[in-house]
């Protein structure tokens, strides 16, 4: 898979997300006409994805531990049923990003949102009653201002390079994010909605500090974007994170964590995609009102 980045006359320039060995002049290219998208819905927490949002454990089951080109797996489980509880009712007015219901996902209430690409005001026509449904089942039908009906499901896709802008204005950071690392909280405080960095040479303890912050920070969701790191560090992250205990619940920290990993040996375009995918997932949970540490 690749992405067209420039068109000049009758020639298109592409960046490829996978290895290009064996590709030669004269090979056929199929244009699917879609942007690189992330699938958003219940079932993301606890997953380990690559930059294209393929669940790596399922890819390993399908094709082995060495990634092959052209192997793609659904990002979210199609057969798992979720306990749907509607909150919207017929006649309600909704816009993109509004919640129409919820399902439990781990320790959180996962809000089912109106897809971000539905522009304008919509009227709820019907809502599926509470029960167990898959992400491919229709949970509501809304009508746009022209009278056209749109079926809403629990999951939808969104281009990773488009910001999730379903808000009126960005609030200025004013509340501290307590990391429980006294050195950071005292001398280098971090605010919710802000950014910070951990610079340092090899072996300085950047990954250890990252794990400590992820485990103890005053946040709801943790998303790890292991982009362009050495394979050893990525393997260390994948192995150690499921073993970390959440101090709030005493259970695995992975229950509220998502890992997106692309090692330094992957193509540059793939590593870039992992950053955009991670940010998109973080913005999705932010839209639910949750605090996300990326």
Predicted region positions:
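Peripheral, non-AAA+ core regions of ATP-driven protein-machinery
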Residues: 1-187
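Switch/coupling sub-region of P-loop NTPases
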Residues: 177-294
């Amino acid at each position: 898979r690749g992405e067209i980045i420039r068109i000049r006359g009758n020639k298109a320039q592409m960046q490829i997300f996978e290895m290009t060995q064996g590709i030669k002049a004269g090979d056929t290219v199929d244009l699917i006409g879609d942007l690189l998208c992330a699938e958003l819905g219940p079932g993301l927490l606890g997953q380990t994805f690559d930059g294209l949002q393929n669940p790596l454990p399922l890819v390993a089951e399908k094709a082995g531990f060495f990634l092959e080109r052209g192997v793609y797996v659904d990002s979210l489980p199609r057969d798992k049923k979720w306990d749907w509880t509607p909150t919207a009712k017929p006649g309600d007015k909704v816009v993109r990003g509004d919640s129409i219901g919820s399902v439990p996902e781990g320790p959180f209430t996962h809000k089912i949102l109106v897809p971000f690409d539905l522009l304008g005001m919509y009227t709820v026509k019907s809502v599926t009653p509470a029960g167990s449904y898959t992400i491919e089942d229709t949970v509501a039908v809304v009508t746009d201002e022209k009278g056209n009906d749109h079926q809403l499901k629990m999951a939808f896709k969104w281009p990773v390079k488009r910001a999730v802008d379903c808000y009126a204005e960005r609030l200025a950071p004013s509340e501290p994010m307590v990391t429980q690392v006294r050195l950071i909280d005292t001398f280098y405080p971090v605010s919710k909605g802000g950014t910070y960095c951990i610079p340092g040479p090899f072996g300085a303890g950047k990954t250890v500090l990252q794990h400590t912050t992820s485990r103890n920070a005053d946040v709801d969701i943790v998303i790890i974007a292991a982009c362009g790191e050495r394979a050893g560090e990525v393997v260390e992250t994948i192995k150690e994170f499921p073993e970390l205990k959440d101090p709030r619940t005493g259970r695995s920290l992975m229950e509220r964590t998502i890992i997106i990993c692309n090692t330094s040996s992957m193509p540059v375009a793939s590593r870039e995609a992992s950053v955009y995918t991670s940010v998109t997932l973080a913005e999705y949970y932010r839209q639910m009102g949750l605090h996300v540490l990326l």
